[in-house]
Amino acid sequence: MSIVQPTCDSWAATLSAFLTQTQVDRTDFVSPESGKPAGSLTVTEGFTSSGAKVRIVDTRLFIADLGLDAAMIHAFAPSQSTSPHLLSDLATMQDPTDDGQRRTTWHFHVDLMPRVDLVTAPEFIDAVYPPITQAYNDAYAIADMLPIAVPHRLRSLASPWLVGAIVLPTDNVATSQAFTAYAKHWHELVNSPPLVSDPVIQRARDIAHRGAMFNDETDP
């Protein structure tokens, strides 16, 4: 029985509730070894209240025999805008304990991916990140939480507000609260982009940034 998928169902529902005129395309995965269902890829496109067209990419993997239970839920703002993308994932892991045993943990990430160079546009920092600072701090204050060793290349492409936490499955309420805070603020920023930018230049930057982010060298 999955412990990740129900939590991520609620995350996906939170994002879908922001949209109207949705179009949904779903592809189911099947294990080549067993022939059993192994997950799915669901792409949902729709419009926010401001008329911005966005895309939610929801990837699920669940193979009980292998102990694989994971989800990635990303919400992409218009490519030509400066509104951040929401990136999140949740997966179970079997981590070693001090007594030589293993325990089931959750590896949790959430971030609002910056859409400009934060060094040259600190006003983007001021416009985007203060409202999620409390959620960031709360995530790292979860009892017995351990920080994930995020690869340096990946961290450099993310924001300083990237949450990477190892928690227990019983911390599902706390992780969902962090996700919801980031998701609601993402929706606000899609409706009101933080900065004005040339749409052609912005789209080219976004393509390059996403190409670097979703790359095996960045996150092997």
Regions found by a protein language model. Name each.
Residues 7, 14, 20-22, 27, ...:
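Residue-identity detector for threonine
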Residues 1-85:
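Short Lys/Arg-enriched alpha/beta "domain-start" segment
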